[in-house]
Amino acid sequence: MRKLAFQSYIFYLVILVLFSSVAFQNSALSQTQIKGPFLDQARFILRTDENLALEDIKSGSLDTYFYAIPNEAANDARNDPRLKVYDKTAGSLGFLLNPAPAEDPNILNPFQFKEIRYALNYLIDREFVVNEILKGYGSPLIDPFGIYSPEYLNIIDTVESFGFRYNPAYASNIISGVLSSAGATNDGGKWIFHGNPVTIKVLIRQDDAKKQSMGELLASELEKIGFSVQRDYGDLNKANVVVYGSDPKSLQWQIYTEEIGGTSAFVKYNPITAGQMYAPWLSGMPGSQNPAYWNYHNNTLDQITQKIAFFNFTSEDERNNLLNDAVKMGIQESVRLFVAQKTDPFVASAKIQGLVNDFGAGITSKYSLLNARSTDGNASVDIGVKQIHQGSWNTIAGLQDVYGKSIYFMVADQGTFRHPYTGEVIPFRSPWTEIVTNGPLDKLDVPADAIKWNQTLQQWVQAGEGSNAKSKVTFTPLYSNWHNGVKMDLSDMMYANYFTQEWGTDTGPGDRTVDPEFTPAASEALNLSKGIRFVTPDRIESYVDIWHYDKKEIADSAVFFPSEPWEILAASERIVLDGKLAYSRSEAQTKGIGWYDPIVREHAELIKAELQKMKNEQFVPAALKDTVTIQDAIKRYDASIDWIERHGHAIISNGAFYLDNFNPAGGTITINAFRDASYPFEAGHWSNYESPQLADITSVDVPRIVAAGQPASIKVDVQVAGQRNGNVTVDYFVSNKDGAVVIRGKAQPEALGQFGIDIPPEMTAKLSPGPNQIKIFATSNEALRPDISSTTILAAPRSVGSGQGANFNNQTIGNQSTAH
């Protein structure tokens, strides 16, 4: 996907590490440093059955599987010397609800009422889902981040305050009151509205046992409290049509068993998750912002999450307050309900080394295949995948499923990546040389010769005198050849910038360059882009009206880097404007045309035919008329036409691998190493990321009894990678009997790897009589996945005094549990 300034629904990728040499050399490769990955080839092979995929890895038919194996098979896999298990603690299971009122006045959709949606939180047994359906591989979840996210410590007070517990009687009482007020009656235990049963249509994913079990569980609970339930079964392809592609008011669905795959890379300050999961403006809510459909609206959530996404805050505290407001309102609205954060066991052959278990993407991260190599000298790997193709691969409003994204990101590079264990921004193909800002309130002058695309005039115009911005980022794109052999240059940068401005601006009726999913998100970002200055072809200044307390986040939003040649983007633009295809799924559904997908041969043939027309017309886009000659354009058209003829698809990019072949009938996708000398990075460049430096709580010494109003002391011992280490942050939170956080703070270092928590009398006075819970998070500053200790402490009247300390040593004692 193109990485453009403020492209708000961007799929975050993993990051680039500084060069480090490695001793290992794949015997299939020359002994000199080579460009790109260690591997020569990776084949993605369809394996829908996880158990069969596991057996294939054991037998050597597959090298790894880019989907979790069954939880019940994980323990045996850990003890099998042929295998290595990688746990992924990202991704979640939940339900998406349809809040649209029915078109038929005699039909009642219960989920049009916020109170009924919210009541489902008490009808869902999250503990059962974790313990029985997930076999303990997960944790209960009510928010979009989860306990292992760096954001969780910022929102823990809000999340803990809800205190959801499985209570079907309480849920039924709420639901009964609302339905009765709406005119429904309960006849013999069944809800009736205007003579019709109150029916709920549940689309249950049957291509995954966990989602199917969870859907059946909720369907049964709904039946128990009087609803008629219509179960519908399908896979992601069906969900793309019925759930994400239909008009909500048609009520083709009312509940969908949804899985969120997590971010495509680990992100420290996640600017868009709250917006994607809760707010309409990013097109992730029912209706998808398609003007032809009924849409869920929430202006308050839009405003809050836009402030987070576009850094419209003046301090870290203000930003975190906004995040808490968004999460609180999102949970209260309950259009999207989170049920469980998964711990997914992924498996690879023990002979495969170098896989990088990114805290967001797991071993499916871009880094894994860039760094993977086999101990048997084989330069090719076979990777099983659950689905080979379940949605469009176009970079505008496609790449919405985890299966397509994980492969596409192997062949496409972006301007910035993310550290796989800290989530911090690191430059990749658009390294920055300077970040200038005067803070959140002061402005910088934008040079008069900085330019922006003017949609009305159809030309680049200068910013002129008097323009200003909060920040300036200077960056130097690392060009290479495209996979079709044509050299990247300034024209690709300009056209990528043009496209976002052209299609991100809606001038009103008659504007044809509008997409209902792309345009609303892009338009919000464009308000903050104040101009681009192309100083030289490889030195660009970007002026943006944003500020962040972490300057690297400013750079991430200001730099950009295209992931497809301008001629492919221009050809697709002409095809879409001709009404043959649409960029977004909802627009394709509305118009009854295809969802543009350049990996599909039929659509690639349309691109090829359009390129031939462009060649015959000697066409040069208006945005490039002063940059590209007719001869240069024709050279590009010929190269891309030749590529499509040879490969049968139009996926042309710039990454360390290129997409060689897509065989839908055979269920395979093949990517090969891009060994072009112009590629900027050598094999071994990412090897430092093979082993995260994780913190481990080795002991917690806490009083058995804490006297309210008296000081209390707790000792915590922490190791990193098996050694005592001071490069650790230890946070603690104490919740009372109602689940409200009443005490919080940071433990203080006392010796190497030893931390002390001293709670003063005025704080212990806030504890509830009886059991309270303390959660301790120990996080290595080099790997932001915490080790978590949860312990019950008893608060007693002051006269009782403190009991003798107990050293728990990371074992289950009483009500303590420790998560890793």
What role is predicted for each listed range?
Residues 29-40, 72-73, 79, 110, ...:
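Surface-exposed, Gly/Pro/Thr- and Asp/Glu-enriched linker/hinge segments
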Residues 32-75, 228-230, 682-715:
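Ligand-site clamp/hinge motif
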Residues 118, 130-133, 230-239, 269-349, ...:
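Extracytoplasmic/peripheral linker and loop segments enriched in polar/acidic and small residues
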